[in-house]
Amino acid sequence: MSVTGGCKMDDLRKPASRNEIKIFDPREASTGLGGAELTDASVVQRNEQWWMYLAGQARGYGATDIYSASLPPGAPLSATGWKLTRGATGELVPVAGRNFSSAWDGHGGRHCPSHVKGWDPRKGEWAERIYYAGAAVNLWGPYTIGFLEWDGEKWIDQPELAFAANEEWERGSVYEPNLIYQDGKWKMWYVAGSNQEDYLVHGYVESEDGSTGWSKHAVFAPSEMKMFDFCVRPRGDAFDAIFSRVWVGEGTPPPETGLWWCRAHKPWGRLSDWSEPIQIMTAEDRGWHSSPWKRSFQFHGQTAESALVFFDGSYRTGDPTPFPIAFTLGCLTIDLPLGSVFNAPKSA
């Protein structure tokens, strides 16, 4: 795959040493879901403990919500050992109620969480948030984007959404947010369009407070790429990104469907300013997943090459139902070389 105008990493080696494992499967009792479907992981370390925030349906139906799982305090990041957060009677517990946000996420639910911590100049303090796409009416959208905010004890839902479509090319719906806080700005990559219409454009914006004053909504990647998410992480003196290219049409997915990796000196708002992407997973049918999407990843340290890439998958169940598909969550462990030499991007 070639991205026109992409900058190069002169010494980049091909990824190596890969292994993948299934974490959650609603039809496999050993994964502990008990029939629930939880995917869209956002993985983060909070106070010396690794947490995973997930979107899904605790009973396999109804409006989706955000749930959590964690590793034991002090344990290193791992693909295994995740324990879902449950209530006193064993039920899955959402991370927050709908005390204020139901007007914009009440019936269609909460989708695709993205954890981030950044400075809120309005309050004059650091804010920890879980951004997500909310649907007011229908599970399938249209969507807007808002967040839950940590108050020191619990996650609090917000009465106002933070971001909505306002450009013609967005077609009234924005979702799949991925955020970082860098250089005094909340930077967000997101999907605009609709899966049902097979129209997916990737956008980019930034804001000083993460809820108002967003920059002009800019196209990050065109619709023909079918980019579904773009997750960015700092590493060393540069930034890594892993994204998925999806296939929501009929027939066999084309070879470019799957997960891709690229790097850049800065978290640029144009795909052409990142390195030439390298495919790290294809749409090959592995039984419990094919055509992976919605990845979150972390490295084993700021200069490490070993990355854990959490991703969504699905498989057909064969059930005589209108939607005979089960959604799974997996993890790919892969070595991603640092690479040290970049050509200067055009926007530098």
List PLM regions with ranges.
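Carbohydrate-active catalytic/glycan-binding domains of CAZyme proteins
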Residues: 2-348
